[in-house]
Amino acid sequence: MVKDINEVLREAKSILKANEIDEREARLLLAFSLETTIEKLFIKKDITGIEYNKYIKIIKKRAEGMPYAYITGHKEFMKLDFIVNKNVLIPREDTEILVEETIKLNKKKILDMCTGSGCIAISLAKYIDNAEVEGVDISKRALTIAKLNAKQNNVVVNFINSNLFEEVTSTYDVIVSNPPYIRKKDMENLQKEVTREPEKALDGGEDGLYFYKKIIKEAKKYLNE
């Protein structure tokens, strides 16, 4: 059964609006669902019943709190494309500031602690000439994604599966990190979308500073003079 595309979009927008989600995502998710571009959607008049069912299923997932990036499987960070799924924290725009400030230092040997998707490590490897970058994470599943992202962005990053510095043997010019930072008592009050992200990547202990303190305490042994 063929459905008018504008009616379908109105239905999707209504579902999203009822769940306090930006209505503009309706068109973006339709393009994703149909594997086409936003531009081509404007000349498309209708969709099939199969296409409609697939699309509405996606819209309902979004309405239930599934992050947009987990639905599409991608997130832009530092003008690079990163693969993301439920095993990694979704890269945040705020974290680009950390990358930009590190690039200014122009250091060549860099460690990214708690690398997750690898977005920080990979961005540094991409934008600093001849940089030697390593990324550490306790999650093997996260590192699987990080390795895919390094390959996709044509950079070489050495990823290490380690609980903080336990398996780290090198020294570095600079150590960067965006570790878990949310206070334990605040974990229960997170936005619906954020609760879909890995708890290990969010829970920063009682005061939210557990990992910061551990990293700062141990980092001096791994920094070049």
Describe the function of each predicted region.
Residues 1-34, 39-46:
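Non-catalytic accessory regions of SAM-dependent methyltransferases
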Residues 4, 8, 51, 138, ...:
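Soluble or luminal CAZymes and related metallo-dependent hydrolases
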Residues 9, 26-27, 55, 68, ...:
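A general structural signal for well-ordered alpha-helical segments in protein cores
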Residues 16, 150, 219:
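Conserved hydrophobic residues forming the short capping helix/wall of the S-adenosyl-L-methionine
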Residues 31-104:
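Conserved AdoMet
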Residues 91, 116, 208:
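Short glycine/threonine-rich catalytic loop with a Thr-x-Gly-x-Asp
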Residues 96-188, 193:
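Conserved SAM/SAH cofactor-binding pocket of Class I
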Residues 140, 191-223:
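Glycine-rich S-adenosyl-L-methionine
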